[in-house]
C-alpha cells in the first residue's frame, strides 16, 4: 500500500495519516489509546466490538450523567462496528474488513487471533502488506507470554512502583495508568515504523509487518538509567519522593500558600540561585557534588526561604532569573492553564448525546495541520451497517453474514 497515493478527498488538513485504514480489536486503554493517536493523525480507525456489550471501558468510570470519560477520551475519531467472532460469519466479515486494511491493532490474549483465523500468518495470505500490531501484558515471547497483565500489576512487576512514592515510604503506583498509556504510544510508534518500512520495501523484498509490545516491556523501558546503574554498581533505589536522584536541588518545595517545583540544572547557575534566595550560606556548596553530600542541610535552607513568600512571588522571581519552575497543578489547573489552550491540548467538543465536554488533543503539533475531533466517541455498533455494506460488496454477502449471526442476534 502506497499511502502517498491514497485518496485524501483533496483535503490537505486531514493529517499525516490521511488515507491509512486501521482496524482495531482492542479494549480498555492501551490498544484504544494507540488507535486514538493514529486517528488523531488522520487515519480512519474502525473499532470492532462485541455485540451488546462492547468495550468494557464503556461502562467504566460512568458518572451519574451516564458519561464514561474513560471511554470517550480513548475512542475519539473512531467508528464502531459490532461483530460476533464466535460465529464463522462474524470471523469471515472481519477477515474481509482486514483484507483491505493497512493496519490491524489487537490486544487479545496470547494465541487467540490464531485460533480465530485472524492471526498474522492468516491475514498476510490475503493482505501481504498489512501492519499487525499485537499488544499483550508480557508480549508474545518468554515464559510469561500467556499470563494476563494489567497496568498496576505491571507497574509493580516492572519496577516503576518501587521508585515511586514518598522518600523512605512504601512504593505506590503512578497516579495515571502509565503502563497502558506508554504501551499505546509504543504501539503507535511501531505502527508508524512498519508503515514506513512497507513504503520503502521493494517489490522483490518480503515485508514482515507484524510487531508486538507488552505492558511489561514498556514499564521496564521506563526504568531507563536505573537498569544501567544497577549493572554498574548494584544500586537499588527506593521511592524517590519528589527529589531528583542526582541533582540537588531539583524537587517540590512548600511556599507560604502552596507548593512549586524548581531546580538548578548546572553549577554555573548556582550563584544566581543563591542571589535570588538571598541566602549567602548556600554559597558554601558551589558544586552539585557538594550539594549532594550536604543535601539535607541545603534543602532545609531552601525550604525555609521558600516558605516566606507566596507561590506566585517565587514563580515570578525564578522566571525572571531564568530558572525552570512551575506550580503543582491539579486537573482544574491544567485545563485552565493558558499553555494548554495555546497548544490545543484539550479540544472542546459537542457530543450529540452527552453534550459539551473536553477531549484530549494530540501532543505533536504538525505544521499545516489543525487537530480536530472528526468523530465523537462512537455509540456501540453505530457504523456497522455503513462499513459492512461497503466491505460485503453486494447485498447477498451482507445478508449471508447477517443470517449467519455475524452482527449478533437482535
Task: Show which residues each predicted segment covers.
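Aromatic-enriched alpha-helical interface/lid elements that frame and gate functional surfaces
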Residues: 248-321, 325
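Flexible glycine/proline-enriched surface loops and loop-helix/loop-strand junctions
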Residues: 170-178, 254-257, 369-372
Amino acid at each position: 500500500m502506497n499511502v502517498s497515493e491514497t485518496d485524501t478527498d483533496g483535503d490537505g488538513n486531514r493529517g499525516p495519516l490521511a488515507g491509512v485504514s486501521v482496524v482495531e480489536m482492542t479494549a480498555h486503554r492501551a490498544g484504544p489509546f494507540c488507535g486514538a493517536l493514529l486517528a488523531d493523525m488522520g487515519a480512519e480507525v474502525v473499532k470492532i466490538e462485541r455485540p451488546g456489550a462492547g468495550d468494557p471501558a464503556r461502562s467504566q468510570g460512568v458518572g451519574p450523567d451516564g458519561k464514561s470519560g474513560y471511554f470517550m477520551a480513548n475512542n475519539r475519531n473512531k467508528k464502531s462496528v459490532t461483530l460476533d467472532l464466535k460465529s464463522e460469519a462474524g470471523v469471515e466479515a472481519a477477515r474481509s474488513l482486514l483484507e483491505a486494511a493497512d493496519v490491524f491493532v489487537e490486544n487479545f490474549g496470547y494465541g487467540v487471533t490464531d485460533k480465530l483465523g485472524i492471526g498474522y500468518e492468516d491475514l498476510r495470505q490475503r493482505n501481504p502488506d498489512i501492519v499487525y500490531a499485537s499488544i499483550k501484558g508480557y508480549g508474545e515471547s518468554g515464559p510469561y507470554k500467556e499470563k494476563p497483565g494489567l497496568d498496576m500489576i505491571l507497574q509493580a512487576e516492572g519496577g516503576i512502583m518501587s521508585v515511586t512514592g514518598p522518600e523512605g515510604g512504601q512504593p505506590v503506583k503512578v497516579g495515571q495508568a502509565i503502563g497502558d498509556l506508554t504501551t499505546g504510544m509504543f504501539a503507535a510508534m511501531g505502527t508508524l515504523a512498519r508503515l514506513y518500512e512497507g513504503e520503502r520495501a521493494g517489490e522483490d523484498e518480503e515485508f514482515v509487518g507484524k510487531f508486538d509490545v507488552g505492558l511489561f516491556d514498556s514499564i521496564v523501558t521506563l526504568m531507563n538509567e536505573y537498569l544501567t546503574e544497577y549493572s554498574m554498581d548494584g544500586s537499588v533505589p527506593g521511592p524517590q519522593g519528589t527529589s531528583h536522584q542526582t541533582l540537588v536541588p531539583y524537587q517540590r518545595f512548600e511556599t507560604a500558600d502552596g507548593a512549586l517545583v524548581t531546580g538548578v540544572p548546572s553549577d554555573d547557575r548556582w550563584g544566581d540561585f543563591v542571589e535570588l534566595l538571598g541566602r549567602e550560606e548556600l554559597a558554601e556548596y558551589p558544586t552539585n557534588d557538594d550539594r549532594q553530600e550536604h543535601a539535607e542541610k541545603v534543602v532545609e535552607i531552601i525550604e525555609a526561604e521558600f516558605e516566606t513568600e507566596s507561590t506566585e512571588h517565587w514563580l515570578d522571581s525564578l522566571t525572571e532569573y531564568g530558572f525552570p519552575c512551575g506550580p503543582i497543578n491539579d486537573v482544574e489547573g491544567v485545563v485552565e492553564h493558558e499553555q494548554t489552550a495555546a497548544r490545543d491540548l484539550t479540544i472542546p467538543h459537542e457530543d450529540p448525546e452527552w453534550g459539551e465536554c473536553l477531549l484530549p488533543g494530540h501532543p505533536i503539533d504538525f505544521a499545516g495541520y489543525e487537530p480536530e475531533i472528526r468523530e465523537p466517541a462512537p455509540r456501540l455498533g453505530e457504523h456497522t451497517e455503513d462499513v459492512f455494506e461497503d466491505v460485503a460488496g453486494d447485498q447477498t454477502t451482507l445478508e449471508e453474514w447477517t443470517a449467519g449471526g455475524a452482527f449478533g442476534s437482535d
